[in-house]
Amino acid sequence: MGDEPPSLEYIQAKDLFPPRELVKEEEKLQVPFPVLPGEGVEYLGSANDAVIAISNYRLHIKFKDSVVNVPLRMIEAVESRDMFQLQIICKDSKVVRCHFSTFKQCQEWLKRLSRATLRPAKQEDLFAFAYHAWCQGVCTDEEEPLIHLCRPGDHVKSRFQIELKRMGFDLQNAWRVSEINNNYKLCQSYPQKLLVPVWITDKELENVATFRSWKRIPVVVYRHTRTGAVIARCSQPEISWWGWRNADDEYLVTSIAKACALNPAVRMPNGNPSNKGNNDGSDNSDTDFDSSLTACPVEGGGVPQKLLIVDARSYTAAVANRAKGGGCECEEYYPNCEVAFMGMANIHSIRNSFQYLRAVCNQVPDPGNWLSALESTKWLQHLSAMLKAATVVASAVDREERPVLVHCSDGWDRTPQIVSLAKILLDPYYRTLEGFQVLVETDWLDYGHKFADRCGHQENREDQNEQCPVFLQWLDCIHQLLFQFPCHFEFNHAFLVKLVQHTYSCLYGTFLANNLCEREMRNIYKRTCSVWSLLRTGNKIFHNLLYMPGSDLVLHPVCHVRALQLWTAVYLPATSPCTPMDDRMEMYLTPASQGPQFHARSLVRLPKTRSMDNLLTACDSGGLLTRTSSDPNLNNHQGNLESCSSSKEGNETEICDIQQQALSIEPKEEDGNDSKSTDHENEDSGSATNQNNNEQNALNNILSIAKPDSIQCKRDRFKSVLEKSSVIPVPSNEGTITDDNSHSNGTSEHLPVPALVTNGSVQNKSCVDVSKAMKLSTELSRTDKKPVFQTQRDEFSFCTSNWDSLPGMMRSVPICEVGLRRPLSYDCSTRSQHSRNGRHTMKLTGNLPASFHCSGPFTKRCRCVMACHTKQVQGSRFLPLACPSPAPLIYQDDDGLPIPSDVVQQRLRQMEASYKQEVDLLRRQVWELQLQLEIRQYCAPPSEPEADYEDDFTCVKESDGSDMDDLYSDKSEDRLSEASWEPVDKKETEVTRWVPDHMASHCFNCDCEFWLAKRRHHCRNCGNVFCAACCHLKLPIPDQQLYDPVLVCNTCYDHIQVSRARELMSQQLKKPLTAASS
């Protein structure tokens, strides 16, 4: 028995969703898109000039100049037109047409699509469950943030208690939280906790539930902090033709107004409202009163305002509902109440109007009577009616300070439309990304909007009469508000477009099932991802750059039809979903989404007006580059470049372009992973000048594209440093730098060091200029310092200059570092050689002219900086240009769908990018000035009493032919000895003061905003607050009495490394002098 295998087998959640077998029509076809976790392509074939694929998540059609990406659950119907045409009708009003060469092929794909878009037999057939299971299955310890981001934030999880506190409900004297609906025993379409007046008992609530349709009793959902008025919601009363009444229902409705009088907004002397309610005390949620008379409101607590009952229907429709057992309130039965009818259409009229709108928007060719056809759909008229109803509610609460009760027939379609829209008009919190999530979760999900029936993804139901774009219509109204008030919403139009897509996509479980009870019974929240993981606050794609935080303005929109706009981004067909957006959005995408290198497709789509003259001819001849309409893609000419490259004997290392400027070496293209080089000894002296001109003109074109004219002068000043930067050549046999700490046999890499080159020859210049160029290449050492998860790619700012610090990405560098970093993006490798004493040495390529040497008071500083960069660049690793695996398509977001384009936001990001580049340029200039002051302070003789140092050192000049003779000449000895007296820095006597956490909302370096997944980190050296990407390195700081490695930012890390290298070099310089004196 003990030898038998165990009867239990442990499986992962993803094993419940095995991948399906791929059916290819042609073997040469490849899947044209990167699949999501859990996604499997089932069919792959060809259409007329297109590749078509069907997975368990989407329909993908790749045309020559465009791409169609449609989730399967967004497809409403599939039809065959004209024998060879397939027409896909989507639920967001779009229509996709695909042509096939044969009738048989068209019918075959019609059957495949029809089977793929059938109603699910069970909820596990929805892709949201497979997606979440595979996200868990592929997650490792390093990718833990992926699962963390699948969940909504704490503001969504604890929204009820947070909202009660934020809105200032007095839970002691006016309101109470009733748990009568615990386990949904009273009403399945309501949440478990309900807010009612404090004196209303649970028994009375049960009696009221028998009188309201679907037991949806009047409950309070919002309180305006400035006026104290509240908004309540419910369903219609069941009066019927018999005229039934319910005393408890009438008492509950009038009690809402009385409770508002007991919990008013107290005006402070400065005019700001203050809530006197005690929110921290215990509530009366579990109190069971025998009679409401014992807890009636205190007389004199304030005169209650007249309550406004807003009926979303017309008066005719409300009276007609009495034949079905419904009806409306009579003002005679409800004292101190007023009834207003809004005249909004029911779901059947909205569905017909939407179908007419879809037909008009997809007419081919473009109709000549477009405006009259659009008017005949009455879609804009329905939006106008909704906005008017919400404005009535907002005006009553804000201006008249009256409580409002909103209902329609059942209370889950037009009621959430009016209530949530009014809350957005009243409360600026709901116009933020965080508040909007709370609003949708509360008014739409908690209070039972039937998303499964209205969106058409409820299993085993084919009732078309239940489908209606109710939520889409409400989002259209939000779009109208965003159009009229572009500065009062934290999110942009792309946010709303994404929300429309995932209302129907079934990629996330947020909008599955009909109510909260069904979601908990089916465990949907734990088995699916949340849509707010994509639309979270930290995602800069959906941030409105025009947003003005801190404004408490109540919005009063213009509701006339002539003031409304058709939502073209959703309703009109996209002629080319990828091409128009890529050219504008490429520079704003997150780095990880662009892949490690430029995708060949994106290079082909580069606008030719941004290209140069014939790049290949210019590089060979050294002529000036002029901006014309040449081919922007050099990959097509790779063969020509390789044929032009030459090689000689020897296994020399490949040298980059800036090194070639000093060494007069012709460029050579990489071939696989081989490392070869060419040495041309007989080059004319003008070759470096020509290449310098090429570099300068290429820099000019890059700057003209990326930078505005407002900072042209700053760019020119900074570019002057780049013109002088190249490589310091060192003798191959003697000019070596020994690394005492290196004991491995691995290969090291060539060190490109900036120097001063003029007309192809190295000149004697001040080391201050060398230090300037050094600063430009210092950032190279940061390449391997900032690891980042690919799942966090949307957390980075789009336009910051810190993209270059992310490993494995394309080298998208700041404009002021193009001249130095471009050559280093190649795979520059070096050989590790053994010296005579057995230590590893790093050999610098090139020969040192006899005329070059560092002399003067800056000699020590220059050598220290060189040593520092030697140590830093040696540990760096650069990726080759050729990427072995294809990069993901850059127009896709994390959900596999296109990124919505917004021209206004793109222009604002360009302005933001220019501003950040200007700030970055000014910071670098300040750093240079500080560096120059530090050099002067370091090299200046200390102010101390005169002393005779002639007997301390004996200067013996050896004549062994070494190039180091001039360094230890008599003229430089005195300056070196004087420079050994290093003055005490003022910072060494001070204690670093930390910036408090509450004062830092953004990273001090990359300016990214802190939130739940991007936490604050203090640098122990400077005390500033950084994100994890900018502050994750550790070093001991003896100056701060911190002898164990502690957390420091990248800037301090570089500064400390430079200081240590300077000290080490100072000690190395003293050893020859001491040996000579002995």
UniProtKB/Swiss-Prot annotation:
Keyword Metal-binding among UniProt keywords: yes
Residues annotated to bind Zn(2+) 2: C1019, C1022, C1049, C1052
Stretches with biased composition (Polar residues): 629-648
Annotated segments matching region Disordered: 267-290, 629-694, 960-982
Coarse class of the protein's main subcellular location: membrane
Skewed-composition ranges (Basic and acidic residues): 968-982
Biased amino acid composition, Low complexity: 270-282
Sequence positions that bind a 1,2-diacyl-sn-glycero-3-phospho-(1D-myo-inositol-3-phosphate): N321, N346, I347, S409, D410, G411, W412, D413, R414, R454
Gene3D superfamilies documented for this protein: Zinc/RING finger domain, C3HC4 (zinc finger) (3.30.40.10)
Residues of the active site: C408 (phosphocysteine intermediate)
Binding site for Zn(2+) 1: C1003, C1006, C1027, C1030
Catalyses which reaction(s): a 1,2-diacyl-sn-glycero-3-phospho-(1D-myo-inositol-3-phosphate) + H2O = a 1,2-diacyl-sn-glycero-3-phospho-(1D-myo-inositol) + phosphate; a 1,2-diacyl-sn-glycero-3-phospho-(1D-myo-inositol-3,5-bisphosphate) + H2O = a 1,2-diacyl-sn-glycero-3-phospho-(1D-myo-inositol-5-phosphate) + phosphate; 1,2-dioctanoyl-sn-glycero-3-phospho-(1-D-myo-inositol-3-phosphate) + H2O = 1,2-dioctanoyl-sn-glycero-3-phospho-(1D-myo-inositol) + phosphate; 1,2-dioctanoyl-sn-glycero-3-phospho-(1D-myo-inositol-3,5-bisphosphate) + H2O = 1,2-dioctanoyl-sn-glycero-3-phospho-(1D-myo-inositol-5-phosphate) + phosphate
Membrane topology term: Peripheral membrane protein
GO molecular function: molecular adaptor activity; phosphatidylinositol-3,5-bisphosphate 3-phosphatase activity; phosphatidylinositol-3-phosphate phosphatase activity; protein phosphatase binding; protein tyrosine phosphatase activity; zinc ion binding
Zn-finger region bounds: FYVE-type: 997-1057
PROSITE patterns membership: PPASE_MYOTUBULARIN, TYR_PHOSPHATASE_1, ZF_FYVE
Protein purpose: Lipid phosphatase that specifically dephosphorylates the D-3 position of phosphatidylinositol 3-phosphate and phosphatidylinositol 3,5-bisphosphate, generating phosphatidylinositol and phosphatidylinositol 5-phosphate. Decreases the levels of phosphatidylinositol 3-phosphate, a phospholipid found in cell membranes where it acts as key regulator of both cell signaling and intracellular membrane traffic, in a subset of endosomal membranes to negatively regulate both endocytic recycling and trafficking and/or maturation of endosomes toward lysosomes.
Subunit structure: Homooligomeric.
Family annotation (PANTHER family): MYOTUBULARIN-RELATED, MYOTUBULARIN-RELATED PROTEIN 4
Family designation: Belongs to the protein-tyrosine phosphatase family. Non-receptor class myotubularin subfamily.
Protein's name according to its UniProt entry: Phosphatidylinositol-3,5-bisphosphate 3-phosphatase MTMR4
Native source organism of the sequence: Xenopus laevis
